Structure formats: structure tokens, C-alpha cells
């Protein structure tokens, strides 16, 4: 059983390394041998579909898919248990339908993939039914634990019997499923989309993972309207992962993990300490400065909070800082990561908005520096008021030593940005280069990265990618409903009726995102609202590069605000303190962040000037 439980990890980790090798070969072949590989990109995308699906399966087993537990935490224990049982039933249905639609799309697939020697696209679509079967097995495993721990009323046996019955119907009497088509009994017309959206909101807020709730709502819509097109729509579940720009996401995740396991984060922190530690509020400045340096390598807020957080909090405690300020600065400074290039959030926005990822990377730099300076100003004020001590000023020898030790790590953002603008590699390939560079300095320079740790890091990155992959798949599916019913245009009409200028629209969007960010995870929020907000921005002639940075900052504020502020929970965990302590500490640091948001909203040129200058 131990080996079966590790199946996804071993297979996914191996495929992850295979993609890594293929893309390294692609870069070397083009830049060194001047002979581009025509098959590398297509093969990497094909393998990524499998890696993403395997990651979803791992997240199903570990029950790590993004969900909202704000309401369920307020419920009495018995009602919470009943609600969780209902949620698990819905997830079970989703996984079965993944298998069902996966088989149908696999059977219908017939086109060749020319770049891979004409092999059938069935190889892509096979990922959905094959790995969904593995998901079902993992789901039943998880239900065994849920039942034993009193989280569900239904034993795993119930789901096993139900699965057998449903598979028997699927293979021997598939027409029976036609009874589920609501349109056979009642015509709901244009109200169908509103019913689907209402159901989506209800089931999402009672704890159904966001990805699965999108899938259920969209299927409900199709059952009420156009079931005949559902097959074509479900193809998008797989094709959504067949994207070269998205390949950057898992490898920036891997880079962040390697920074922690390869001894890089500690050296970054020590360099920041030697530079800033002797000023008033020194260790707070070190915390913020280290986050700025780390953000140029990982592109993730939570990677910063989890990776540097423990180190930063310990150093601040040792220097005499109160726990609330230790946690507050650590949480607030982690939002610099998604603004300063490289940025996973910017990559996802670029894919959704079909905008230049390179321009988005450049556009986020100035706001990232502004937030850094604003946080330092607030830290200075608090340190002055509370009388926090300063560390002794580093000697020239200490400064040179810390710089020498961190030099190779500090080169990472320069390598990424320089490579993109010189044309040596694309933004996607920059993630591969960043990961490769992290391996080299972790293994051969700092000598703290082992082959076993490297493989385990690939597995961890694959598992995190699975959470993102489910969101990408189902939000693309959901987007088909939004497009068919022109929901985005209807929302835009409301904005047009209320707003009289682009600035008014931006204020309304900021207010909406700030409110939603209190309850919805930043990643989920990005996938859920951007497809509806981007058309509004276009209608008001708002620059989409500016819009991407503004919405990214807004969503990062969401990870700092209760009750769903993920950074608060991560920092509380790594700092061994309560969430309320972190929340208390982060409140004063929200002021400079809000001021920065207001500034860039009123003066979008702060964001657009540099990218327009460098990339006309």
C-alpha cells in the first residue's frame, strides 16, 4: 500500500523532471547549437497535462484543493459534519463525471499532433479518464479517514458501492443518464445562467472546493440549456492545460522550493541584515528587504511567507520585537513577491488576458519597490514608537562576506529579466532557467541540495501545481458558460450605467476585489473574476498591463485580510503564534499598502511608463 500511495508522486516527479530536461534541451539547442527542436514544446505541453492531472489526484488524497470554510467554521459541529458529508458527495460526483466525460472525449479524439510525428491527440485526452480513475481511488481513501475521524456520516463502503453502480450504468446503460437533463422537463431560458451562478455561490461557500464548484455550476447550466454542446465544452478541460505559458507556473514554484532547500534563503536574509540591520527598526527592514530580494526569485507571496518567514520571525524575536510586529511585517512584506518579477500571478493574468508577460513583469517592479519603501516607513514609525533596538552596524568585512555568500543568489532576478529582454529565452523558459540555476548553486556552490531533496522538491512542486491545474481546468469550463450567456458584457453594462469615467470604474473594481478578497483565496479570485473584469476594462479603454498590476496588488491585499487571509495562516503556522496575533500586527501595515493602491489607481503612469518605454 505504501508504494501505491506514492504512485502519483513518483510518476509525477519523474514527468516533472522529464519536462525540465526537454525544455533545457530546447534552450540549449536553439541558443548553443542554433538548431531549434520542433517537437520539444508540444511534448512538454503533453507531459504537463499529465503532471497537472496527477497533481490534482495528490491534492484529492490530501484534501488540499482550495475551499472556503468561513461559513462552515461558524456552524455547530453536527451541522458542519452533515455539510461536509454533502460536500464529499458532490466531489464524488465531480470525479465520476471527469471519468465519464474523459472517456467520451477520448473516444471522439482523432486529430494528429504534427509536431510529435503525427501521434493521435488521444494521448492528450487519455489523461482525463485514466487519472480521474486514480482520483476516485484517492477520494475513497480520503473518505476512509474522514469517516474514522468523524468528519463525515458516510463510510468509504458507500462510495465504493455507488462507484460500482455508476460505472455499470455508464458501460451497460448510458442512456439512463439522460434523465439528468433538466431541459427535458422544463425550459428555463435566460434564467438558467442565474440559477447556475446562485448554485455555484451557495455550494462554494459551504465548503465545496472552488474548482469543483465551478464544474458543478457549469454542468448544471448545460443540463438546463444546451446539453448537446457539453462534449465540445469538456474538451476545454484538457486543452486548458495544453498551454506553453502555463509551464512557467510549476517551475517558478519549484524555484521557490529550491531556494529554501538549497540554503539560498538564509544567505539572502544574512545579506539584507548586514545592509539594513543597524537602522531604526533594523530587523523589520531586514525582513522587508529580504522579501524584496526573495521575490525576484520565487514569484510567490506564500513561498516568501513560508520560506523566509520562520527565519525572519526568529531573528526579530531574538532582537526583542513583539510577536504581533514579527508576524505583521512578515505577512505584509510577502505580498511584494507577486509584484516584482518574476511573478506567478502575472503569468496567470497574462494567460487569461492574452497580454505580454514580459511587459507585466516590468510593470510590477516600480509598485513593488514603492510598497517596499512604504512598509519600511511604517516599520520605522512603529520601531521608533516602541523603542525596538538596532543591531550593530556590519563591518566592511562582514558586509563583503555576506555579499559574497549571497552573490550567486542575488544574480537570479538579473538572469531572469536579462534573459527575457535579450531574447535568450521566453518568460516560460525563464522559469526553467531559474530552476536550473537554483539547482546549480544549491548543489555545487552552497552544497546543501541533495539529489533526494531535488526529487522531493519536484514532487512538492507537482502537488502544488495540481491545485492550480484544477482551477485552470474548471474556470475555463466555467468561462464557456460565461461567454455563451455574455455575462461579462451584462456586468459591463451595469458598470457603464453607474460609472461616468475610467477612474470611477477602477474605484468600483477595487472596492469589489477588496471585499471579495476577504472571503475568497487570491488564486481562486484571480480565475473567477478576471474573465469578467477584463472586458469591462477594455470597454473603458483601461490599459490591460496597468489593470493586471492593479488587480494583482488588490488580490494580494486579500491574503492579508481576515477571515480568509492565507498569509495570516501561513505566518501563524511557521511563527508558532495565533492568527489573531498576526492579524493585529498586520493592520498598521495595510495603511501603506492601501496608499500605494490609491496612488497607482489615480496615476496609472507609475505602472505603464517603464514597460511602454522598454517594449513599445
UniProtKB/Swiss-Prot annotation:
It is found in: Cell inner membrane. GO terms for cellular component: plasma membrane. The chain crosses the membrane at residues 9-29, 36-56, 83-103, 117-137, 153-173, 195-215, 244-264, 288-308, 332-352, 357-377, 407-427, 431-451, 459-479, 505-525, 527-547, 552-572, 587-607. Residues 1-190 are annotated as: TRAP transporter small permease. Residues 191-616 are annotated as: TRAP transporter large permease. It is a multi-pass membrane protein. Keywords: Cell inner membrane, Cell membrane, Membrane, Sugar transport, Transmembrane, Transmembrane helix, Transport. GO terms for molecular function: transmembrane transporter activity. InterPro entries: DctM, DctQ, TRAP_DctM. Its main location: membrane. It comes from the Bacteria. The complex comprises the extracytoplasmic solute receptor protein SiaP, and the fused transmembrane protein SiaT. In the N-terminal section; belongs to the TRAP transporter small permease family. NCBIfam families: dctM. This is Sialic acid TRAP transporter permease protein SiaT. It comes from Haemophilus influenzae (strain 86-028NP). The lineage of its organism: Bacteria, Pseudomonadati, Pseudomonadota, Gammaproteobacteria, Pasteurellales. The gene is siaT.
Amino acid at each position: 500500500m505504501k508504494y501505491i500511495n506514492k504512485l502519483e508522486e513518483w510518476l509525477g516527479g519523474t514527468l516533472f523532471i522529464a519536462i525540465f530536461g526537454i525544455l533545457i534541451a530546447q534552450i540549449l539547442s536553439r541558443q548553443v547549437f542554433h538548431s531549434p527542436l520542433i517537437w520539444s514544446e508540444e511534448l512538454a505541453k503533453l507531459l504537463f497535462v499529465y503532471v497537472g492531472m496527477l497533481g490534482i489526484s495528490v491534492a484529492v488524497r490530501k484534501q488540499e484543493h482550495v475551499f472556503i470554510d468561513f461559513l462552515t467554521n461558524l456552524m455547530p459541529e453536527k451541522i458542519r459534519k452533515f455539510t461536509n458529508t454533502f460536500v464529499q458527495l458532490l466531489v464524488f460526483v465531480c470525479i465520476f463525471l471527469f471519468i465519464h466525460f474523459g472517456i467520451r472525449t477520448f473516444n471522439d479524439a482523432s486529430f494528429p499532433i504534427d509536431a510529435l510525428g503525427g501521434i493521435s491527440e488521444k494521448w492528450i485526452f487519455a489523461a482525463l479518464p485514466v487519472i480521474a480513475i486514480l482520483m476516485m481511488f484517492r477520494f475513497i481513501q480520503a473518505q476512509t479517514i474522514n469517516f474514522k475521524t468523524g468528519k463525515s456520516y458516510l463510510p468509504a463502503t458507500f462510495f465504493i458501492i455507488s462507484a460500482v453502480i455508476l460505472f455499470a450504468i455508464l458501460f451497460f446503460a448510458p442512456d439512463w443518464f439522460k434523465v439528468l437533463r433538466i431541459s427535458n422537463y422544463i425550459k428555463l431560458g435566460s434564467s438558467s445562467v442565474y440559477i447556475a451562478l446562485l448554485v455555484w455561490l451557495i455550494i462554494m461557500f459551504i465548503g465545496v472546493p472552488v474548482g469543483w464548484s465551478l464544474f458543478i455550476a457549469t454542468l448544471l447550466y448545460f443540463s438546463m440549456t444546451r446539453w448537446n454542446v457539453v462534449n465540445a465544452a469538456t474538451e476545454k478541460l484538457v486543452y486548458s492545460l495544453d498551454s506553453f505559458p502555463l509551464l512557467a507556473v510549476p517551475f517558478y514554484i519549484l524555484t521557490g522550493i529550491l531556494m529554501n532547500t538549497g540554503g539560498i534563503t538564509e544567505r539572502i536574509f544574512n545579506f539584507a541584515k548586514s545592509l539594513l540591520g543597524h537602522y531604526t527598526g533594523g530587523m523589520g527592514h531586514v525582513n522587508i528587504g529580504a522579501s524584496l530580494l526573495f521575490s525576484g526569485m520565487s514569484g510567490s507571496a506564500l513561498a516568501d511567507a513560508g520560506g523566509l518567514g520562520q527565519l525572519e520571525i526568529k531573528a526579530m524575536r531574538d532582537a526583542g520585537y513583539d510577536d504581533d510586529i514579527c508576524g505583521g511585517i512578515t505577512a505584509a512584506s510577502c505580498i511584494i513577491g507577486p509584484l516584482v518579477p518574476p511573478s506567478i500571478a502575472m503569468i496567470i493574468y497574462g494567460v487569461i488576458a492574452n497580454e505580454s508577460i514580459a511587459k507585466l513583469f516590468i510593470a510590477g517592479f516600480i509598485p513593488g519597490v514603492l510598497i517596499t519603501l512604504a512598509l519600511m516607513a511604517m516599520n520605522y514609525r512603529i520601531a521608533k514608537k516602541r523603542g525596538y533596538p538596532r543591531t550593530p552596524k556590519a563591518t566592511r568585512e562582514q558586509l563583503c562576506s555576506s555579499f559574497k555568500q549571497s552573490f550567486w543568489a542575488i544574480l537570479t532576478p538579473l538572469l531572469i529579466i536579462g534573459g527575457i529582454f535579450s531574447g535568450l529565452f521566453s518568460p516560460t523558459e525563464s522559469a526553467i532557467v531559474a530552476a536550473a540555476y537554483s539547482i546549480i548553486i544549491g548543489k555545487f556552490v552552497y552544497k546543501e541540495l541533495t539529489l533526494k531533496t531535488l526529487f522531493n522538491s519536484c514532487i512538492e512542486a507537482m502537488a502544488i501545481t495540481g491545485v492550480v491545474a484544477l482551477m485552470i481546468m474548471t474556470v475555463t469550463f466555467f468561462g464557456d458558460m460565461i461567454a455563451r450567456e455574455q455575462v461579462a458584457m451584462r456586468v459591463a453594462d451595469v458598470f457603464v450605467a453607474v460609472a461616468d469615467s475610467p477612474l470611477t470604474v477602477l474605484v468600483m473594481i477595487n472596492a469589489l476585489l477588496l471585499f471579495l478578497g476577504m472571503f475568497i483565496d487570491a488564486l481562486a479570485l484571480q480565475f473567477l473574476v478576471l474573465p469578467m473584469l477584463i472586458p469591462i476594462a477594455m470597454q473603458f479603454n483601461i490599459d490591460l498591463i496597468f489593470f493586471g498590476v492593479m488587480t494583482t496588488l488588490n488580490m494580494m491585499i486579500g491574503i492579508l485580510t481576515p477571515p480568509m487571509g492565507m498569509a495570516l495562516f501561513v505566518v501563524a503556522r511557521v511563527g508558532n503564534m495565533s492568527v489573531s496575533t498576526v492579524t493585529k500586527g498586520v493592520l498598521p501595515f495595510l495603511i501603506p499598502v492601501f496608499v500605494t493602491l490609491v496612488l497607482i489607481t489615480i496615476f496609472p503612469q507609475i505602472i505603464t511608463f517603464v514597460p511602454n518605454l522598454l517594449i513599445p
